[in-house]
């Protein structure tokens, strides 16, 4: 078996004593630095951004104003002037340590954040919720830019100015492409509903003739040719068949007969503005096809980014495809940022809310609302896929269903279990013996099929497969080499020969054999 792990049940983890506890958030604590230089020598620069300008001020740790609130235009010259004022204030008041705190406001906070960071200042981000909580008690009913700046200072002193880790390549590109693809998919899904609606208004009941309307090669082509049932009957079987032949669309006569049978029944239905609805849905369908082509191109690029990360190992799990693994890698970022699996579910908010006061304790409420929703959506989509396509998680879902567990709660349980598996699979190189890996999928074969479906050029396919080999654990190389050799042999024995794949797989197989040999020399288990 290619995946296995040795468990030591007798060993118990020794919990380290947590003597140095702090009430501040770990990535927002500034107390040690303030203690080192003194509160009068520690400055906090607060920035309240808008679209074209920001308000900012500078004060020491104790709240003494060093630079009063003023407006900063989002221009290079204005940023340089603000930096110069800060430098002068640092010299005048003997400031030895400084941080810049910028309130998160959509994307409007990015220009001042990057400008101060490029000037050499440590730049942190504060959430608007924290600003509000520190503004309302001090200035109830009075929300201005100035009161917001004062509240930001109080929140930063309390440790809510948080350091954010910048994503490095390829995670930055992967995140932008994955979010762009998801946006296109959502827009295409909404557009598909509009197409169905206008198609139904122009040709009632036509869409019900096909199980998969948009995947059928003939359904929308025939509907685009005729804007009414009467015109379908006028063309007849011979006319429709000739039209499809001219467009080089493969079809069956029984499909045309089914359409004509529907047209004979619908020809007497009262249809209002049929030609207008036909023109609308055909225009929408052209845009839908453009979205579909762009999505396919982005997916090819996502695969190229995914193979540069260890998240490609997740393809060995049945139910995980290239797009799912790429979206997870995009939203999680480098796995080294997570100390344990609870950090993953904590960031995604996959844990119940709690309300406790005195002897009242409601500790099993709904999952929390304030969380990283993008990461949560990715994990829940993967949980749906695992419940359908992975035997292990499908069995757990069936058990929960038999017990009457809510389907949403069952999916959350699967997502939490999967997060532990992600950490073990991506962060470490140890062999895995999770039930998911009893019959693992081939990572390279999944990638090859994905690129075959997306019609990726051979040179890009070879490059992605070779990069993916470098991400594989040593213990999986022999297993992958066997599958690659088997696929190559099957294609070689075909009448048409190996084709383009015969130029790709030998190089990949050689790379796998080299890694397997290195593993044996190093004494790794396979």
Regions found by a protein language model. Name each.
Residues 2-526:
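A detector of single, family-specific signature residues
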């Amino acid at each position: 078996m290619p995946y296995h792990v040795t468990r030591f049940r007798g060993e118990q983890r020794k919990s380290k004593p947590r003597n140095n506890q702090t009430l501040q958030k770990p990535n927002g604590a500034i107390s040690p630095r303030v203690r080192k230089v003194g509160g009068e020598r520690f400055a906090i620069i607060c920035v309240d951004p808008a679209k074209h300008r920001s308000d900012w001020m500078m004060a020491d740790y104790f709240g003494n104003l060093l630079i009063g609130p003023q407006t900063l235009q989002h221009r290079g010259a204005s940023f340089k002037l603000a930096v110069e004022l800060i430098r002068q204030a640092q010299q005048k008041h003997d400031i030895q340590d400084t941080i810049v705190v910028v309130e998160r406001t959509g994307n409007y906070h990015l220009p001042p954040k990057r400008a101060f960071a490029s000037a050499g200042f440590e730049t942190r981000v504060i959430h608007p919720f924290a600003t509000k909580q520190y503004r309302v008690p001090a200035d109830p009913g009075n929300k201005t830019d100035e009161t917001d700046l004062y509240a930001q200072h109080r929140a930063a002193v309390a440790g809510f100015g948080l350091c954010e880790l910048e994503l490095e390549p390829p995670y930055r590109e992967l995140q932008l492409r994955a979010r762009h693809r998801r946006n296109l998919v959502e827009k295409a899904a909404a557009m598909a509903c509009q197409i169905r609606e206008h198609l139904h208004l122009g040709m009632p009941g036509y869409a019900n003739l096909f199980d998969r309307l948009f995947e059928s090669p003939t359904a929308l082509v025939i509907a685009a040719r005729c804007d009414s049932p009467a015109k379908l009957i006028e063309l007849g079987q011979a006319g429709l068949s000739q039209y499809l032949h001219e467009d080089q669309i493969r079809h069956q006569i029984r499909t045309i007969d089914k359409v004509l049978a529907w047209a004979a029944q619908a020809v007497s239905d009262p249809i209002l503005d049929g030609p207008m609805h036909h023109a609308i849905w055909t225009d929408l369908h052209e845009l839908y096809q453009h979205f579909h082509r762009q999505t396919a191109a982005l997916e090819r690029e996502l695969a190229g980014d995914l193979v540069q990360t260890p998240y490609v190992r997740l393809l060995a799990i049945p139910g995980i495809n290239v797009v799912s693994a790429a979206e997870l890698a995009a939203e999680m970022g480098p796995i080294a940022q997570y100390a344990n699996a609870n950090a993953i579910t904590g960031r995604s908010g996959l844990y119940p809310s709690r309300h406790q006061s005195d002897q009242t304790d409601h500790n099993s409420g709904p999952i929390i609302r304030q969380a990283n929703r993008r990461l949560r959506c990715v994990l829940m989509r993967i949980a749906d896929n695992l419940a359908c396509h992975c035997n292990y998680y499908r069995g757990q879902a069936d058990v929960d269903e038999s017990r009457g567990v809510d389907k949403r709660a069952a999916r959350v349980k699967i997502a939490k279990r999967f997060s532990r598996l992600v950490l073990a699979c991506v962060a470490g190189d140890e062999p895995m013996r999770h039930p998911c890996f009893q019959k693992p999928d081939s990572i390279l074969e999944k990638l090859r099929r994905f690129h075959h479906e997306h019609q990726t050029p051979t040179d890009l396919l070879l490059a992605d497969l070779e990069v993916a080999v470098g991400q594989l654990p040593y213990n999986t190389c022999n297993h992958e080499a066997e599958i690659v050799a088997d696929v190559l042999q099957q294609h070689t024995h075909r009448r048409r020969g190996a084709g383009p794949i015969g130029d790709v797989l030998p190089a990949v197989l050689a790379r796998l054999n080299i890694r397997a040999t290195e593993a044996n020399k190093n004494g790794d288990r396979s």
